């Protein structure tokens, strides 16, 4: 094997190791510092509720016209932010149920925002939403992944729930069926 090919393989292995280590480190810290709610069932077993809310000052994303937009300044009651990518199969599979979940709630009370992380251009996102008939969700972009990195998102899909006072109250890493009864009940409980 020649040196350029060997160098590429070594570099690929180093990046894979870093990616795996970063995800496992984050998962361990999430499990040790967070707790699940007593009696969680079904898909909500995957949700980690923070023991202390985590303050978030800004959520800067790009709109379709490439202008910056701060999600924290919109005055929603509860925000579910879903980080995803068009190339991420689990993201693609969960998106229709996420769209259905938004249809069940007044968007001024519970707002579901999707943020395409990484190299997802607006045309590709728009085509994806059209092809999969996603009509209830707003889409934004985090093209450099800087917001995802700032929030400790190292795998996709990932979702965080933000309270009206701007604090992250919990997160979920991985796909779920967003219209399972336990999930819907959880979001209904946030409105009480």
Over which residues does each language-model region extend?
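N-terminal targeting signals for export/organelle localization
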Residues: 1-60
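A short beta-strand-turn-helix
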Residues: 58-79
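Loop/turn elements at helix/coil->beta-strand transitions in domains of secreted/extracellular proteins
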Residues: 75-78, 108-111, 136-137
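Short pre-active-site segment immediately N-terminal to redox-active cysteine/selenocysteine motifs
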Residues: 77-79, 83-87, 155
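Hydrophobic beta-strand anchors of alpha/beta hydrolase catalytic cores
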Residues: 80-81, 112, 159
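C-type cytochrome heme c attachment motif
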Residues: 86-93, 158
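Structural microenvironment flanking redox-active thiols in thiol-disulfide oxidoreductases
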Residues: 93-132, 143-149
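Thiol/disulfide oxidoreductase modules built on the thioredoxin-like
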Residues: 127-135, 141-189
């Amino acid at each position: 094997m020649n040196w350029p090919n060997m160098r590429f393989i070594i570099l690929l292995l180093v990046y894979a190791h870093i990616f795996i280590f970063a995800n496992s480190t984050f998962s361990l810290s999430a499990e040790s510092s967070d707790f699940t709610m007593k009696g969680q069932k079904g898909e909500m077993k995957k949700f980690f509720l923070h023991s202390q809310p985590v303050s978030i000052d800004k959520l800067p994303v790009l709109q379709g016209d490439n202008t910056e937009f701060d999600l924290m300044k919109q005055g929603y009651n509860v925000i579910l932010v879903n980080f995803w990518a068009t190339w991420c199969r689990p993201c693609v599979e969960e998106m229709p149920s996420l769209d259905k979940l938004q249809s069940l709630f007044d968007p001024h009370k519970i707002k579901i925002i999707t943020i395409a992380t990484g190299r997802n251009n607006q045309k590709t996102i728009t085509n994806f939403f059209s092809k999969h008939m996603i009509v209830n969700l707003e889409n934004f972009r985090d093209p450099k992944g800087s917001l995802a990195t700032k929030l400790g998102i190292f795998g996709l899909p990932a979702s965080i729930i933000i309270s009206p006072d701007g604090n992250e109250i919990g997160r979920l890493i991985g796909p779920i069926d967003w219209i399972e009864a336990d999930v819907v009940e959880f979001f209904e409980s946030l409105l009480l």
